[in-house]
Amino acid sequence: MVRCLIALGGNLGGSELLFQRAIEQLDADGDRVLAVSRNFETRAVGEQAGGGFLNAAAVLESAAGPWQLLQRLQAVESVCGRERMLRWGPRTLDLDLLLFGESEQWESGLILPHPAMWLRRFVLSSAVEVAGDMWHPRLGQSIDQLWQQLCVPQFAVGVELSGELAESADFAGFLEQPLQHGAVSFQRSVAAVGVAVNWFARLQLRRADLRNPPWSYPEAYPGDRTLVLFVRSPENALEQLRQTATAITG
């Protein structure tokens, strides 16, 4: 049996009852539910997401493999009325597989640990209640340690243009001046060469295409706090930075 961390979310009404139904279904399907957090009201991330969310976390013991468990979570979403019409849109129930023991996996459709979990306040606020000791193998930190890094007043985030974006005329002058969004300051990381900056995170922006996931880890993952964002244009990049700031600060 493998200890797994699951995130629950929803914002179309009745989320509390759907969370309970999902937990009961997972327990009945052969996974053993060890702990469930309180429900937290959180801000929606992105204009398409709709109104505020209810979020929670659960710890399971599962005899299934990671792909089997992912398919089981998606089946429970469907039973609870989830319709996948709009990516990042409003939803009745969202079940995300965050951690599968200390497994690391990088495949189309399943990346473990979840690439964006470590900077999302709406994920960690509930996860720390039930899984503070669970380990993020890529960052080499516990959930409790990741949560503590969100409990600061200001966040400096370095932004790098990667691949063709670095040479793109569309992105000429992009983020020449730091972008302040609430408590989060986004700065081009190249501007800080030779300057010691205690980055909360680094974002690597790459050109999006239809094959891309929304986020990923860099190929050569150095163990630092780096996230790849796939963007379509400077305007889309700025929107994703604003969404990232909302995810960090809640």
Language-model regions, residue ranges each:
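Nucleotide and nucleotide-moiety/phosphate-recognizing core
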Residues: 2-6, 12-87, 92, 101-104, ...
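Residue-level signal for short, function-critical loop segments
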Residues: 9-10, 163
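Glycine-rich phosphate-binding P-loop
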Residues: 157-178
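Flexible, gly/pro- and Lys/Arg-enriched active-site loops
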Residues: 45-52, 70, 74-78, 82-163, ...
